[in-house]
Amino acid sequence: MAEAFIQVLLDNLTSFLKGELVLLFGFQDEFQRLSSMFSTIQAVLEDAQEKQLNNKPLENWLQKLNAATYEVDDILDEYKTKATRFSQSEYGRYHPKVIPFRHKVGKRMDQVMKKLKAIAEERKNFHLHEKIVERQAVRRETGSVLTEPQVYGRDKEKDEIVKILINNVSDAQHLSVLPILGMGGLGKTTLAQMVFNDQRVTEHFHSKIWICVSEDFDEKRLIKAIVESIEGRPLLGEMDLAPLQKKLQELLNGKRYLLVLDDVWNEDQQKWANLRAVLKVGASGASVLTTTRLEKVGSIMGTLQPYELSNLSQEDCWLLFMQRAFGHQEEINPNLVAIGKEIVKKSGGVPLAAKTLGGILCFKREERAWEHVRDSPIWNLPQDESSILPALRLSYHQLPLDLKQCFAYCAVFPKDAKMEKEKLISLWMAHGFLLSKGNMELEDVGDEVWKELYLRSFFQEIEVKDGKTYFKMHDLIHDLATSLFSANTSSSNIREINKHSYTHMMSIGFAEVVFFYTLPPLEKFISLRVLNLGDSTFNKLPSSIGDLVHLRYLNLYGSGMRSLPKQLCKLQNLQTLDLQYCTKLCCLPKETSKLGSLRNLLLDGSQSLTCMPPRIGSLTCLKTLGQFVVGRKKGYQLGELGNLNLYGSIKISHLERVKNDKDAKEANLSAKGNLHSLSMSWNNFGPHIYESEEVKVLEALKPHSNLTSLKIYGFRGIHLPEWMNHSVLKNIVSILISNFRNCSCLPPFGDLPCLESLELHWGSADVEYVEEVDIDVHSGFPTRIRFPSLRKLDIWDFGSLKGLLKKEGEEQFPVLEEMIIHECPFLTLSSNLRALTSLRICYNKVATSFPEEMFKNLANLKYLTISRCNNLKELPTSLASLNALKSLKIQLCCALESLPEEGLEGLSSLTELFVEHCNMLKCLPEGLQHLTTLTSLKIRGCPQLIKRCEKGIGEDWHKISHIPNVNIYI
């Protein structure tokens, strides 16, 4: 890594020497000599990096060079910071503190120059060859959509495992566990994913859960993760182990589930026995699939013969390599093919090796570069279990300089951790790994670097959620990154401190990352770039925080702090301040606007924030502002957003404080093309402007057409803005509008071509249809298809709503999968919802029955929930038409007297029936005994059914005796 950071330092020195600040204190010659000395040393670094692998003295020399490099970087950084501060003062170079500062810098420069001369002299002992430094490989253009490559050579294995799982008939007490066993890099996780997503598996199991276990086999953590996976949401608050166990058993009880435990290392039999005891409540055929490298793990956990994964054939390895190295290139150099096949032989049939080697060579088309990989001495180094580590080391050594340290830095994240791309880029920036190129923003440079590492197969399992990109590293790739850091440790120059839930020290390439419970004296860490105190119990920052002149990244996520010290505003180099979910924080320091380098002010979830610091608009570097609380006074108003080029998402609150549309226009939202998510809210409990003014204000807050997510809360205007009827929302994917009681009609949302999720909560009692326009008379987009992309529709509390469309046509809601109806007593379903798979009807306090034809055209409905319909006495017989229905839940329907005899007989796919708190339900229908697919029946809080369903003697027992899992609760 030394050569990578030296290149960064040289670029910084070159840029600095061209500027005016270097002239301020008269150190131009000294900095020039430093630059020349580093250039001389840099010429031999590539050779040194390759030879250090089996040369301890050379490794020590590189460590000394590393330490000196970071020391020079500190001097340069401090010089620029102080020089900027002095130049902006009224005294300029005649500031009284200039002379002592010059003396201090001069002394440090002399000391580091002596060190570098000794290091330069020592390099002669190693007979290193000079090489021309390759600055950067040619970058290829990439799109924003990232897809996993095709899987080669594993179809046979997938089919065999699927058959084992589907044909498993063991009962719950003998829970089947199938381990997939194989060395690292063979593709165990990929194979498990193929099985998990196979259509046959999806149809066979009632529930599928995927858990990445890694090295921490903690029962409580795993049970919590399984519960969260099943429920699809995080558990709020802490729960003890016993209630967690009970909750999991309730969720799994009577279900034929598939649980995948990926990457298991636990060799403690008792730990597995404890977890297995909780899992033994499922239906016959419930299974656990594990992946592991360790035979002992397979023997401890497995009840079935471990499935040993073999190496890929040379042919499949070649196909995988070729797909990565050549892509869809039509003409391929036959000489490269010949060399490539020799390289693939060295990969030993390990997919990860073939994939990464192909990934690095896809940027190289010179035969010499391919021969260099084939003939590298790294192949001859001692190996552990396979040829994978030499292949991965080669992949690293082939990276351009600017990618090497960015990759190795990822070692600071725990193994198997889900990483956030945007956060990682901010951390790269904080450590100075990214340099601006032309007019490109640093964030865009970081995005390019990230994409290149992804294309070279260093990153995997890409997931995009809420506008953010998450990813993982294969554990062997993570091991490589960690080994690179460990080889370049410098304990004298700590640049990053993390607070985590465990206490130990991890060596990394440019410093050490320190993990601790109590905050140490910050003055000990003068070189600190990153301070990570996320989720800590600290409720106060010391005033010495202002002395960390190099600090770029401060993470206080989830801390209990109520305020921040004013000394924080002395941090001129601070780029990221993460205050997300600091729920007690009520204000920021008044001089926050002095943080001139601040790029990310993250405030999501800090709901106690009552105001913004004044003049936040002067932070012209600001790219991310999670929240903006509107104020009434100048310096606190919406106009502060006007000149900011914001990225990502922003939540604007207290819009009732905006006086008029003129003030709203000053926010200049229509020019912010890099915003993808916008939330706007009014507080209806304080002083309020007139409703007519609110319409004008919202009209003036028209966003840019690049927006993909829009949320509006508490709007009291009489109609929504005109820009909702327009192509302004042509890229919108999700809309949520809540508490807008005065709007008597809705915009034509059916026009929006990309809209996938529409949530309308607490609307006007005057609204009768979600869309009232005629199909052929609408603005914006010339299409007859209404809601062409909508997948989720969630409607709450529209007291007069009759239907979705006033005029129905054949082409409407073609892909609508999920629908939630709350407190809409008169709403009838459209006649054409062929794609609908999930329907929830809740809080209908009026209807005593549903329309007879209500469920007639829902041919693909799989999940139906009817809840809190207090006066509902019967269900329509059209229930029988739901041939695809797998789960039926009827909850808190206090007046329901019976289930339809004919309505249940047609449910030929039903596997789960749950009836809860239906006090008036007198008996179960005869048709239940004909439902041969039904495996789980749960009845709770139905007093009249308890005796009738008593095992063996109850009047209704014969109707349900064939069901494997029957649970009846008081």
Curated annotation (Swiss-Prot):
Induction description: Constitutively expressed.
Gene3D superfamilies recorded: 1.20.5.4130, Helical domain of apoptotic protease-activating factors, P-loop containing nucleotide triphosphate hydrolases, Ribonuclease Inhibitor, Winged helix-like DNA-binding domain superfamily/Winged helix DNA-binding domain
Residues where ATP binds: G182, M183, G184, G185, L186, G187, K188, T189
Family assignment from sequence similarity: Belongs to the disease resistance NB-LRR family.
UniProt keywords, alphabetically: ATP-binding, Leucine-rich repeat, Nucleotide-binding, Plant defense, Repeat
Pfam families (alphabetical): LRR_8, LRR_R13L1-DRL21, NB-ARC, Rx_N, WH_DRP
Renumbered ranges of LRR repeats: 525-548, 550-571, 573-594, 595-619, 638-662, 672-697, 752-777, 787-811, 813-832, 833-857, 859-882, 884-906, 907-931, 946-970
Name under which the protein is recorded: Disease resistance protein RGA2
Single GO molecular function: ATP binding
